[in-house]
Amino acid sequence: MTIDSGFNHITVLLDEAVEALALRADGCYLDGTFGRGGHSRLILSKLGPQGRLLGFDKDPQAIATGQALAAEDGRFVIVQRSFAELGAEVAGRDLAGKVSGILLDLGVSSPQLDDPERGFSFLNDGPLDMRMNPNQGISAAEFIATAPVEEIARVFKEYGEERFAGRMARAVVERREKQPFTRTADLAEVLKVANPAWEKGKNPATRAFQGLRIHVNNELGDLETGLEAALDALEVGGRLAVISFHSLEDRIVKLFMRKLVKGEADNLPRNLPVQHKTFEPRIKLIGKAQFASEAELKANPRSRSAVMRVAEKLR
């Protein structure tokens, strides 16, 4: 467990993820989602003097934590970028095709969820923001204030998998014409009233809030870009471990890995004039999808939706 600004964060699948990277003492590794540094600290504890670790994060608070770690350990460097940009960062450091392992721990962290001022939570009132980097892009409030009802409904449905997306979007637009949304609790209440069928044990605003967060931070687009960049950055034999927390993320990871296991030309007719190498696998899967243990679920209920997939680069 790491503690930041009074908010507890328990790293999910900590030992399993680091073990999946098959660390070499002198290897070069990337933590694409530094967060509060749980995975990074464990990786560093297993690297030798020649080992290196490069961390990425968009969140200013995560960067501050990372800079403190970098000051303590010269083997570690933190950069304030999305892991979707790791290709450019790796190229600039002459590490393309030389990275031994990459870890991506997707989604929002507990400190982000639990800090009302970040605007991620429908349980604790705060400014309606939701940006991983509050200094970049438009906030959730700005999106809600200007987007057409069809676009809001699309975000709720496509990214939040909300059954009543249209109805909830119309309620949002109707209310914003009278008074703009600036607070999370205000939006959550309107969504709650507009949702006609509450799921047992789940806040009726959950899916819509997820959709907003994913849209505001371009999470799925970043994931698709980041996976491609990660594969290019890895050396042959390098490992990629990805932890996802909802079906949309996991579907992207699963399809990406499946495509590369079968060969990139898997969907092409076999009589097309393409090189045989195009059909050869680029990765192999390491084991099956992993989930949190019973012990971890008891210690950290938020780990219940975590799933980790691991692949090794073949060429």
UniProtKB/Swiss-Prot annotation:
GO MF entry, a single one: rRNA (cytosine-N4-)-methyltransferase activity
Any GO BP annotation: rRNA base methylation
Keyword rRNA processing: yes
Annotated positions binding S-adenosyl-L-methionine: 37-39, 57, 83, 105, 112
Catalytic activity: cytidine(1402) in 16S rRNA + S-adenosyl-L-methionine = N(4)-methylcytidine(1402) in 16S rRNA + S-adenosyl-L-homocysteine + H(+)
Functional note: Specifically methylates the N4 position of cytidine in position 1402 (C1402) of 16S rRNA.
Gene3D superfamilies with a match to the protein in the record: Putative methyltransferase TM0872, insert domain, Vaccinia Virus protein VP39
Species name: Pseudomonas entomophila (strain L48)
Key word S-adenosyl-L-methionine present: yes
Protein name, entry field: Ribosomal RNA small subunit methyltransferase H
Stored InterPro entries: RsmH, SAM-dep_MeTrfase_MraW_recog, SAM-dependent_MTases_sf
Compartments, as annotated in UniProt: Cytoplasm
SUPFAM superfamilies: Putative methyltransferase TM0872, insert domain, S-adenosyl-L-methionine-dependent methyltransferases
Similarity comment: family membership: Belongs to the methyltransferase superfamily. RsmH family.
Main location: cytoplasm
